[in-house]
A protein has these predicted regions:
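Mature-chain termini and adjacent capping regions
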Residues: 1-174
Length: 174
């Protein structure tokens, strides 16, 4: 009788663990699709407004907060109304489907057509407002500036910049 009770106890416990594992797997976010060598061109009124390139994209549109993940590098090229381009690269990015935000992380570099460059570890890009911002440490380099700081806020062309907690040098015309 003892072996029979032990057998049923073993079966019951092992089944309940399997059910728990299964439930945890259902809760885990698993991409519903993936794609390799992404090249996505966005247009506005027949003109190219942006180009996104990445070696890999994971689609998590089944998540509670849907998003696309770019785990192995991303390059985004933004064009202004004069067809000048701003290039953004990073090691990793998440593009949130229910908002206009792209969260870029790791070796983030933004370069404009004037060769103004922002370097940081994390940056948000708001596609709707065409706005860049971070609260992380940054370095901003242009022909007459080399600024270090923590916190940066700007339009995509670096025409309206707000630096926070800065140090560095700026050339002034007298």
């Amino acid at each position: 009788m003892k072996p029979l009770i032990l057998f049923f106890l073993f079966i019951f416990l092992s089944c309940s663990q399997d059910k728990e594992i299964f439930n945890n797997l259902k809760k885990a976010e698993i991409p519903i699709s993936s794609a390799l060598q992404i090249n996505s061109v966005h247009t506005d009124s027949g003109k190219v407004s942006s180009v996104l390139n990445s070696p890999k994209m994971l689609n998590f549109s089944n998540a509670i907060f849907p998003y696309y993940e770019f785990p192995n590098h991303i390059e985004v090229i933004l064009y202004d109304k004069n067809n000048n381009k701003t290039k953004i690269t990073s090691d990793y990015a998440i593009s949130y489907s229910n908002s206009d935000l792209i969260d870029l992380r790791g070796n983030v570099i933004v370069s404009t057509h004037l060769r103004d460059t922002l370097i940081t570890d994390q940056l948000y890009y708001d596609r709707g407002q065409e706005w860049l911002f971070t609260n992380f440490d940054f370095r901003y380099v242009s022909s007459d500036k080399d600024i270090f700081g923590k916190g940066f806020d700007s339009d995509k062309s670096f025409e309206k910049i707000k630096f926070l907690e800065v140090n560095g040098y700026v050339s002034l015309d007298e």
